[in-house]
């Protein structure tokens, strides 16, 4: 629902969660 509900490194995009790697 909210991006704050997603774990650290994950972003709520649309109706799915996408994992974003800051280092790589």
Curated annotation (Swiss-Prot):
Residue span of region Disordered: 1-24
User: Basic residues composition bias: which ranges?
Assistant: 10-24
Task: List, for all copies, the residue spans of the domain called C-type lectin.
Answer: 13-24
The organs and tissues expressing this protein are described as: Expressed by the venom gland.
Tell me the keywords, alphabetical order. Answer: Lectin, Myotoxin, Secreted, Toxin
Q: List GO terms (cellular component aspect).
A: extracellular region
Q: Where found in the cell?
A: Secreted
GO molecular function terms listed in the Swiss-Prot or TrEMBL record: carbohydrate binding; toxin activity
Q: Does the keyword Electron transport apply?
A: no
What is the purpose of this protein?
Answer: Able to depolarize frog skeletal muscle fibers, but has no effects on squid giant axons. Tetrodotoxin is able to partially antagonize the depolarization. Induces myonecrosis.
User: Member of which family?
Assistant: Belongs to the true venom lectin family.
What name does the UniProt record give this protein? Myotoxin TmC4-47.2
Q: What organism does the UniProt record list as the source? A: Thalassophryne maculosa
